[in-house]
Regions:
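Retroelement reverse transcriptase polymerase core
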Residues: 1-223, 228-239, 244-245, 261-263
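C-terminal functional segments of enzyme domains
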Residues: 240, 254-257, 261-279
Length: 279
């Protein structure tokens, strides 16, 4: 229906739609085009749920502007005002609130590991849990900003692994400055924890390509790493799942480059260092 407009000047998620324009002078033309499309399909909009000429607003629970994506202040406030959990149900509530903000949190699983441990045995709010809870609130005292990707630009991916977690940071570059686009991570389970380091890196890449599929489909994604991940995945003697991951990742325009600048190496080291420390 909006095949020509989506990702150009329209973003759609289920029944939520945004018509966006970089230049104010183009906005009326974009609106007219989209209204004509709606009319051609005899579709109507609810005026009470429409807003026009908005420079910043809430979309899918986030505050979105031309330059940044902010955490919804209401979601931050809900965490900041929470008292330390007193039982498993309250820990589950805390984990649920954090899960809605995953994309804004570097190393979410590492930060929340003490909370998960309380769910495995009889409830006990330990000193480690208290420290993690305080650290989480401190993190949100200066809400992080994410930068929306631009059509056609390269995006850069940093991978980090530990014994039990893989972490991924997707960033873009603007005027020589790298800005985060999305953070994601995944706890390793069962046999995944026993993967050799190179297989964990490959698994981190596949995890990212699945979680961030829309970015991988729309952009060239550059993996900034000094590890020979592609060679390991395409090695005929590698484990069977490595070959499958190689095939899966080949569907996207993925490139591999070493960290050549100081800022790239600093960021890569920062992510890796704290992943291992907390893992």
């Amino acid at each position: 229906m909006f095949v020509y407009q989506i990702r150009r000047d329209v973003q759609v998620y289920m029944d939520n739609m945004i018509v966006k324009s970089r230049r104010k002078d183009d906005h009326l033309d974009h609106l007219k085009e989209n209204f004509n499309t709606l009319c051609s399909y005899n579709m109507k909009l609810n005026p009470s749920k429409c807003a026009f000429g908005v420079t910043i607003g809430k979309f899918l629970g986030f505050m979105v502007s031309q330059r940044d994506i902010e955490v919804n202040s209401n979601k931050i406030q809900a965490i900041m005002e929470m008292a330390p959990p007193r039982n498993i149900k309250e820990v589950q509530c805390l984990n649920g609130k954090v899960a809605t903000l995953n994309r804004f949190i570097l190393r979410t699983t590492n930060k929340c590991l003490p909370f998960f441990h309380t769910l495995k045995n009889s409830f006990e709010w330990t000193a480690e849990c208290k420290q993690a809870f305080d650290d989480l609130k401190a993190y949100f005292s200066s809400p992080p900003l994410l930068s929306p990707s631009r059509p056609g630009e390269e995006l850069f991916l940093y991978l980090a692994i530990s014994l039990i977690v893989v972490n991924v940071s997707l960033v873009r570059e603007e005027e020589g400055v790298q800005k985060p686009v999305y953070y994601t991570n995944r706890a390793l389970r069962g046999a995944e924890e026993r993967y050799p380091p190179m297989e964990k890196l490959a698994f981190a890449l596949i995890t990212a390509s699945r979680k961030l599929k829309s970015y991988f489909q729309a952009h060239t994604v550059v993996i900034l790493t000094d590890k020979p991940i592609w060679q390991a995945m395409s090695n005929p003697e590698a484990a069977g799942w490595m070959a499958l991951w190689a095939i899966e990742s080949s569907k996207f325009d993925v490139q591999y480059r070493p960290c050549t600048t100081i800022k790239e190496q600093v960021l890569a080291n920062f992510i890796a260092k704290f992943t291992y420390m907390e893992g």
